[in-house]
């Protein structure tokens, strides 16, 4: 049986105290470099679903813009709110028609929910790692960790 691929992009963290950086992470050198890295890393992959976290004025981290980060990625892009995460994963898991590639770009406040869904051992797995790609294989709501890509090591 072919397994599906889930790539989770954990957007970067900006030091708010650093007044020399631009207001928005995706416009900073760090954010631009990460976006270009993603464009290159995913250049040969077409995604059946690309989910990026919506901007909610009340809860959003103003330094992150997932949509801009994944600008060059090929596939159908859908915005999601963190309250829709569980429902979104249900939809992804229902599609068992062959192989599919799914990309999820999320910001700070969603990592607890995602950790619970994919069943990672600890919140720390997502909590401290910014500008990373996490690759999972999945089938029938069962997620297996494949690898973590650290952009600074490449």
Task: Label the model's feature ranges.
Residues 2-95, 110-154:
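Active-site-proximal alpha-helix that buttresses catalytic centers in soluble enzyme cores
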Residues 6, 99-105:
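Residue-level preference for the first positions of well-ordered beta-strands
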């Amino acid at each position: 049986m072919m397994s599906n691929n889930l790539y989770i992009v954990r957007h970067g963290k900006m030091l708010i105290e650093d007044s020399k950086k631009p207001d928005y992470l995706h416009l900073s050198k760090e954010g631009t470099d990460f976006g270009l890295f993603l464009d290159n890393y995913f250049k040969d992959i077409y995604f059946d679903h690309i989910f990026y976290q919506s901007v909610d004025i009340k809860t959003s981290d103003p330094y992150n813009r997932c949509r801009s980060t994944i600008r060059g990625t090929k596939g159908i892009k859908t915005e999601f709110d963190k309250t829709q995460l569980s429902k979104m994963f249900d939809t992804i898991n229902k599609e068992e028609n062959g192989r599919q590639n799914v990309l999820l770009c999320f910001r700070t406040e969603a990592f607890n929910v995602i950790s619970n869904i994919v069943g990672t051992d600890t919140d720390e797995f997502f909590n401290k790692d910014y500008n990373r790609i996490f690759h999972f294989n999945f089938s029938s709501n069962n997620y297996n960790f494949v690898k973590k890509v650290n952009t600074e090591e490449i």
